[in-house]
Amino acid sequence: MDYRKLHGWDLSPEEAIKVQNELRKKIKLVPYEGEPEYVAGVDLSFPGKKEGLAVIVVLEYPSFRIVEIVSERGEITFPYIPGLLAFREGPLFLKAWEKLRTKPDVVVFDGQGLAHPRKLGIASHMGLFIEIPTIGVAKSRLYGTFKMPEDKRCSWSYLYDGEEIIGCVVRTKEGSAPVFVSPGHLMDVESSKRLVKAFTLPGRRIPEPTRLAHIYTQRLKKGLF
């Protein structure tokens, strides 16, 4: 798959923040109408201190049948800094994206979208590169305030930055911690909440696209795939 080359990656943390502040102006928060035919999940892990591994799994929806899996392993040059993970993980994701033959209608990232100090988490940032609707689903809160949803599957509450709604906190599995859902690009809060609920099977905490991407990341790390 092709993508837009919006900036280089040889940046200092200060330069990276400036890039985020410029790119955030380009984000489009719009409803996603209908249902996707193909949905992709993205997971990244770090087998070594300077080595990263990106996996993209494309699923048919609503069967969740795996259509394609691509991966990319390579050197990581940007330091780990909360709020700047796209600069650490983005280059590997884009190299994996270039290998993809099946175009997904929606891409789900294990990370943040709008729920970010500068409104540009990895789901938003990479969404601008690939120009496909994206959603961030994180296991923990990076930014924003919320009231804990009740311990009931599919219960939820809004995530706020002041009075602005920047995402949702969704209890996908009873008895488990909620996930933090926010739109990336070409997506809005309500659509991202609706789709993440639809992508998460009963008894699971993590939506199938990123859950399966994580499974294959771990298999690749162990040399089992």
UniProtKB/Swiss-Prot annotation:
Primary role: DNA repair enzyme involved in the repair of deaminated bases. Selectively cleaves double-stranded DNA at the second phosphodiester bond 3' to a deoxyinosine leaving behind the intact lesion on the nicked DNA.
Enzyme class: hydrolase
EC number, UniProt record: 3.1.21.7
GO MF, any single term: RNA endonuclease activity, producing 5'-phosphomonoesters
The family this protein is said to belong to: Belongs to the endonuclease V family.
GO biological process: DNA repair
Keywords: Cytoplasm, DNA damage, DNA repair, Endonuclease, Hydrolase, Magnesium, Metal-binding, Nuclease
Requisite cofactors: Mg(2+)
PANTHER family in UniProt: ENDONUCLEASE V
Catalysed reactions, as listed in the record: Endonucleolytic cleavage at apurinic or apyrimidinic sites to products with a 5'-phosphate
Gene Ontology CC: cytoplasm
Domain of life per record: Bacteria
Protein name: Endonuclease V
Binding site for Mg(2+): 43, 110
